[in-house]
């Protein structure tokens, strides 16, 4: 099954400049913790970089960043912000093997159709080195659907998301639930997942603070 949604990509193509240009704070605290858990100069793949807001903070943390987005239009906007090339990469085209110390996927895998998400997580798992760190965030819910802009969201529950990660071997997986915002400006429940690639645990349980 394809991991892309045409209507969602069409939205980002049409709104790329406005989306990238909006006032948005990078996830500084999470990025700092992410970078601190990696070796100096760690090679990190960023998925769904959008306008490049997090990319700036990741680069400032001293990481060897490979920033990408599935939307050519957003990749161009991010490239302008960063002053360096940003790759166009659809999730279903991730084909690296043990190439990255970390993967940063903030607010992007939430657009992957539910049926396709376990396969995409498997691709990310394969792209990570042993002991590699993987961060992703999702808008929480109980059933997949679309927002008022027509964008698709998988809206997982914590238990559903755990099952999506479960088929792969993760040394640890930490899931935290928080209220945050979004492009529509509305308060939104979010799931923040940090996982470490390893073979010690299979079908790991979700940890809660």
Place the predicted regions along the sequence by residue.
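Conserved class I S-adenosyl-L-methionine
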Residues: 1-50
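Class I SAM-dependent methyltransferase SAM/SAH-binding core
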Residues: 51-93
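A short acidic, Gly/Pro-enriched loop at the edge of an enzyme's catalytic core
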Residues: 92-103
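A short glycine-rich, Lys/Arg-flanked "PGG" loop and its adjoining helix->strand segment in the class I
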Residues: 118-130
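Conserved beta-strand signature within the Rossmann-like core of class I S-adenosyl-L-methionine
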Residues: 131-138
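Acceptor-substrate binding/catalytic loop of class I
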Residues: 144-160
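Core SAM-dependent methyltransferase catalytic element
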Residues: 182-209
């Amino acid at each position: 099954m394809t991991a892309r949604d045409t209507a969602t990509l069409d939205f980002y193509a049409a709104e790329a400049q406005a989306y990238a240009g909006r006032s948005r704070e990078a996830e500084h605290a999470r990025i700092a913790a992410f970078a601190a858990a990696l070796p100096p100069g760690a090679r990190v793949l960023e998925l769904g970089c959008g306008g490049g807001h997090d990319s700036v903070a990741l680069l400032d943390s001293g990481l060897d960043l490979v920033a990408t987005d599935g939307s050519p239009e957003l990749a161009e906007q991010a490239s302008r912000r960063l002053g360096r090339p940003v790759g166009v990469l659809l999730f279903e085209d991730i084909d690296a093997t043990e190439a990255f110390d970390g993967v940063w996927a903030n607010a992007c895998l939430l657009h992957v159709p539910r049926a396709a998400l376990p396969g995409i997580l498997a691709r990310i798992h394969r792209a990570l080195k042993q002991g590699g760190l993987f961060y992703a965030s999702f808008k929480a819910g109980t059933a997949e659907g679309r927002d008022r802009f027509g964008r698709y969201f998988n809206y997982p529950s914590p238990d559903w998301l755990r099952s999506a990660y479960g088929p792969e071997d993760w040394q640890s997986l930490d899931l935290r639930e928080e209220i945050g915002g979004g492009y529509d400006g509305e308060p939104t429940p979010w799931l923040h997942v940090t996982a470490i690639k390893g073979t010690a645990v299979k079908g790991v349980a979700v940890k809660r603070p």
